[in-house]
A protein has these predicted regions:
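Charged DNA-binding/catalytic regions of mobile-element recombinases
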Residues: 1-173
Length: 173
């Protein structure tokens, strides 16, 4: 088979990088929001996991949830409510639909989360698998938060980090 060129080519372990030609940013506020999560390591070994939402027009950080456990689907639903209330006050349903762009993490793609999003007027959208650049705005925010806030502020324990998060996000905005 080798002599006749019939063997399959060996896999070298690297993946072909997915090229993203789409556009995350939009020209008007409240058209598309993006969300992602990150982990902050504390000096004492604790980890704080944070999920956040940004407007894809003005990049405003509109809401966040933080926990020392894993981010759950319920946390993401709470984030959706907090984000909607941040922009529009207490409403049951958005007047016009807004896209909610996220990766394919289990809390985001959970059936209850997607149904809840549609019930309040959000349109859940996910990025292609293995394509973090498709949610580049959220990925850039993660890098900014870690570089400009986490690295230069004390992070002795989870409680301190969780208490500082609102101040960091206010300063970012």
């Amino acid at each position: 088979m080798k002599v006749h060129g019939l063997l399959l080519q060996r896999h070298n372990g690297s993946r072909e990088e997915r090229r993203h030609d789409g556009r995350v940013a939009v020209d008007r506020r409240n058209t598309r929001w993006c969300s992602d999560a990150l982990e902050i390591a504390c000096d004492n070994g604790e980890k704080v996991r944070v999920a956040f939402a940004l407007d894809c027009c003005d990049r405003e950080a509109m809401g966040h949830v933080a926990t020392t456990g894993g981010i759950t689907a319920e946390d993401i639903r709470d984030l959706m409510v907090a984000t909607v209330e941040h922009r529009f006050g207490p409403v049951n349903r958005l007047a016009s639909p807004i896209e909610w762009l996220s990766d394919n993490g289990s809390p985001y793609v959970a059936h209850d989360t997607r149904r809840f999003a549609r019930d309040i007027g959000l349109v859940p959208r996910t990025t292609p698998v293995s394509s973090p650049q498709s949610n580049g705005m959220a990925e850039a925010f993660v890098r900014t938060l870690k570089r400009d806030y986490v690295r230069v502020n004390p992070t002795p324990d989870a409680r301190t980090v969780i208490e500082q998060l609102p101040r960091w996000l206010t300063h970012y905005n």
